[in-house]
């Protein structure tokens, strides 16, 4: 029995075809599929024309950022049209991250990429989700917000001038060009997130130098910006889950009226936590500093992409 798994964002979709022995037969990429922003014909064109498979799948599991509860029936219908006779299931990217990280065990699942999202997962379903709100109102921990903090630092002077000079050379932009990218051109969030490789490179390069050197001091200044981004993610997104679990275990009267308590059979204490996404992957050290060293959470996995975990989940 062949299984087809998709992990889709707005820009690209990663596909893996798995055979009956659990082996990966084929992997490929197509355009991103987001049913919120795309017409049926556009989605079907990608599924039927861009996705070329050596064999027909019997099961199709699609995880995407645009697959809300309201969009699930429509996405399932499109998958059924593209793969007649196959069992199909469309889910959001958050449940995909949770399954990839924890399988059927409970945990706090987090996505840290261009944007940020998180949820409390009971091993089957999402129990609680702090709304991410996007990079203007929220998205703490994301690449877009890290880029925003970085630009604020270089232009307002909280980061060393040498970093600003190197960044302007690296990006080929000046102050008016950056303002234009952020406020006048589309997809400002992607532009802001595109700054993160520079930040990562500068930290890695600076850490090669001895204590007291300018390069190391500059790297540590950038490291503190990354830490502040992850602190904000913890405080604004993770604390609600922790408070909910603690109230369920210690005093259910603290729960909001009508809220069901966290299932005591899922274990004592705060559930384990895991992360998916490029920002979590490339900034693993500061992420662990904040989550493990400062807040004493049990970080079990940090994955750049969820596909490996999804394959394990669907072939177990």
Segment roles from a protein language model:
Residues 61-68:
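Polybasic, low-complexity association/targeting segments
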Residues 31, 63, 119, 131, ...:
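Residues in well-ordered beta-strands of folded domains
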Residues 68-165:
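Phosphate-binding/catalytic loop of phosphoryl-transfer enzymes
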Residues 1-59, 78, 82, 101-108, ...:
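ATP-binding/phosphotransfer module of carbohydrate and carboxylate kinases, centering on a glycine-rich
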Residues 9, 16, 65, 95, ...:
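Anionic group-transfer/hydrolysis microenvironments
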